[in-house]
């Protein structure tokens, strides 16, 4: 087995090729335990713990220690770790790339691996994680499907009668034309063809302002068959990602519109410059690309994919049969990463697992999946019951408060072990009145507010709009006064009155004096107004009587009146209030009646 690791998949020895037998059930269902996969050919006991798999991501193709370290530092692994903490199922790499489609540019950085834990990357993982919470639950049919059903590997068994545990050799389908069905004949045919004309590959990666490209030949290298002959290579880096916020400037512009700043302008310029630089690489490598047998591209996100497939005169078509994606986790777009990916693609994978262990472990996976499914369903049912119970609590509490039945309210809290600061549910319905104290304030019930405060209702609690009860009591002076009185009587240490935005403390006597003073002031103002109205009434009556006398004299004396005095009289009446005019009219009618009686 040690000899196999010294070759790549296109330079396997003839004696090894002769002993290979395609394992259909192995390659289709991918039942291998990758704890036993090794590029070095070390035989591992099938009972040992699976150290080459990742439980968080549910993969088991981590063949070496370096690959395991690399995977642990990858954004995909960190993302699934966050999901596991919150009891959510992991996502596949394709799902992860779909989630971060509009965010991914900032997930790629420099070649330094220490940068993978940078503040920008952490922010992006957090952003992608929050976005993933909007993804619906996986249906049961999908849960039953093993994510390795469409495995990128095809497995061959190495027939060896003397071996107690069978040996399997895996090759990536992506390295063959028509990669859906790889046979032994195709593997032998490809090896013969590779000797005559070495396989030529083009590899491209772009993301986060980083671009790496390489055209390599699988020409035999006697020193290391896993190292290609590099025909051309290019790396480019441009500042295009938004620090802290994350994502590309173009994605931000599409969402929020153009932002005018020095940094945004520079990023827009660099995005266009990066596209031009990549197009120039394609133009310079045009003839080499035509001779390539396979083209591997990693371009996550619509903006990155458009660089390869949507630009004028694009040399790569999305329907090109030579086009491939990398069938494993990749890191930042650097030349060393391209070399690592090449080595991963051409290195045969070796597994020492017996069929009994495979079936047992597969059954264990299915059993664990069923258990996890039951746990998720149970958790959902429990959450639904909890929501209904909270809604019922809210309904009863509001009913008691509305009736000002504080005793029934407190008894209900005690019997159901609820806090007096109980948060009403659902929160989106009770944004303004989130707690009993908020509700009592909106009901303008000062007595209820006073009782709630003295029973421990916290005035510093915020409602759904971020307001304290005191802040929403601005329309009722009596309710506001109860907060000031409570602050005085309960003391400064009873609640955080400053956080509650409650004003300076005042005693009930002070409040009553203020109310009495205000009441006296209003009463005095009312009396002053009545005195002024009475004075105006008397003056108006006097003027009317005098005018009536003059009118009578003129009516029975010389000449006839032109009615000017009547106009003046009407004007004077118009200046009075409606009540005063009515009183004057009644008195005028009474005076006229008396005069008629005297003349008879």
Curated annotation (Swiss-Prot):
InterPro entries with a match to the protein in the record: Ankyrin_rpt (IPR002110), Ankyrin_rpt-contain_sf (IPR036770), ANKZ1/VMS1 (IPR047139), VLRF1/Vms1 (IPR041175)
Membrane topology category: Peripheral membrane protein
GO molecular function: endonuclease activity
One BP annotation, GO: ERAD pathway
Compositionally biased residues, Basic and acidic residues: 520-559
Record region (Disordered): 239-263, 517-563
One of the record's GO cellular component terms: cytoplasmic side of mitochondrial outer membrane
Keywords: ANK repeat, Coiled coil, Cytoplasm, Endonuclease, Endoplasmic reticulum, Hydrolase, Membrane, Mitochondrion, Nuclease, Phosphoprotein, Repeat
Phosphoserine modified-residue sites: 38
Compartments where located: Cytoplasm; Mitochondrion; Endoplasmic reticulum membrane
EC number: 3.1.-.-
Catalytic-site annotation from UniProt: 249
UniProt ANK repeat ranges: 432-461, 465-492
PANTHER family linked: ANKYRIN REPEAT AND ZINC FINGER DOMAIN-CONTAINING PROTEIN 1, TRNA ENDONUCLEASE ANKZF1
Functional description taken from the UniProt entry: Endonuclease that cleaves polypeptidyl-tRNAs downstream of the ribosome-associated quality control (RQC) pathway to release incompletely synthesized polypeptides for degradation. The RQC pathway disassembles aberrantly stalled translation complexes to recycle or degrade the constituent parts. Vms1 acts downstream disassembly of stalled ribosomes and specifically cleaves off the terminal 3'-CCA nucleotides universal to all tRNAs from polypeptidyl-tRNAs, releasing (1) ubiquitinated polypeptides from 60S ribosomal subunit for degradation by the ERAD pathway and (2) cleaved tRNAs for recycling.
Family: Belongs to the ANKZF1/VMS1 family.
Domains as described in the record: The VLRF1 domain mediates binding to the 60S ribosomal subunit.
Name of the protein in its database record: tRNA endonuclease vms1
Lineage of the organism: Eukaryota, Fungi, Dikarya, Ascomycota, Taphrinomycotina
């Amino acid at each position: 087995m040690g000899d196999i690791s010294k070759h790549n998949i296109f330079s396997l020895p003839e004696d090894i090729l002769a002993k290979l037998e395609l394992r259909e059930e192995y390659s289709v269902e991918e039942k291998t335990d990758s704890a036993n996969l090794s590029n070095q050919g070390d035989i591992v006991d099938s009972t040992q713990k699976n150290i080459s798999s990742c439980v968080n991501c549910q993969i088991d193709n981590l063949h070496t220690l370096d690959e395991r370290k690399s995977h642990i530092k990858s954004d995909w692994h960190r993302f699934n770790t966050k999901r596991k903490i919150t009891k959510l199922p992991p996502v596949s790499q394709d799902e992860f790339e779909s989630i971060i489609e509009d965010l991914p540019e900032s997930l790629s950085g420099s070649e330094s691996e220490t940068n993978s834990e940078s503040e920008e990357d952490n922010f992006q993982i957090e952003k992608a994680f929050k976005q993933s919470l909007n993804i619906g639950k996986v249906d049961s049919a999908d849960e039953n499907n093993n994510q390795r059903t469409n495995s990128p590997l095809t497995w061959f068994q190495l027939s060896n009668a003397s071996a107690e545990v069978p040996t399997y050799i895996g090759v990536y389908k992506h390295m063959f034309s028509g990669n859906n069905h790889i046979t032994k004949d195709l593997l032998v045919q490809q090896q013969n063809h590779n000797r005559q004309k070495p396989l030529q590959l083009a590899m491209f990666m772009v993301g986060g302002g980083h671009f790496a490209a390489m055209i390599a030949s699988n020409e035999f290298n006697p020193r290391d068959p896993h190292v290609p002959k590099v025909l051309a290579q290019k790396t480019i880096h441009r500042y295009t990602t938004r620090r802290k916020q994350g994502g590309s400037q173009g994605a931000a512009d599409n969402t929020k519109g153009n932002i005018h700043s020095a940094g945004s302008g520079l990023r827009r310029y660099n995005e266009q410059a990066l596209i031009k630089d990549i197009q120039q690489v394609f133009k310079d490598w045009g003839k080499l690309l035509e001779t390539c047998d396979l083209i591997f591209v990693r371009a996550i996100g619509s903006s990155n994919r458009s660089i390869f497939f949507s630009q004028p005169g694009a040399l790569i078509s999305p329907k090109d049969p030579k086009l491939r994606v990398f069938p494993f986790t990749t890191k930042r777009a650097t030349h060393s990463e391209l070399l690592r990916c090449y080595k991963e693609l051409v290195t045969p994978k070796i597994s020492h697992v017996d069929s009994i262990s495979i079936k047992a472990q597969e059954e264990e996976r299915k059993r664990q999946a069923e258990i996890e499914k039951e746990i998720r369903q149970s958790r959902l049912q429990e959450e639904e019951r909890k929501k209904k119970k909270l809604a019922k609590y809210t309904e009863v509490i509001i009913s008691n408060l509305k009736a000002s039945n504080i005793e029934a309210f407190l008894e209900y809290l005690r019997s159901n072990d609820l806090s007096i600061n109980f948060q009403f549910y659902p929160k989106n319905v009770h944004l303004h009145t989130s707690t009993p104290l908020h509700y009592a304030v909106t009901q303008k019930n000062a007595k209820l507010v006073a009782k709630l405060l003295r029973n421990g209702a916290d005035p510093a609690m915020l409602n759904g709009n971020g307001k304290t009860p005191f802040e929403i009591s601005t329309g009722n002076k009596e309710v506001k006064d109860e907060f000031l009185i409570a602050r005085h009587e309960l003391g400064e240490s009873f609640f955080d009155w400053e956080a509650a935005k409650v004003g300076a403390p005042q005693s009930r006597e002070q409040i009553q004096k203020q109310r009495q003073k205000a009441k006296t002031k209003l009463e005095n103002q009312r009396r002053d107004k009545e005195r002024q109205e009475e004075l105006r009434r008397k003056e108006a009556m006097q003027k009317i009587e005098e005018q009536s006398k003059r009118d009578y004299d003129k009516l029975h004396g010389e000449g006839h009146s032109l009615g000017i005095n009547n106009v003046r009289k009407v004007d004077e009446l118009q200046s009075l209030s409606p009540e005063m005019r009515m009183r004057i009219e009644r008195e005028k009618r009474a005076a006229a009646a008396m005069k008629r009686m005297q003349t008879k």
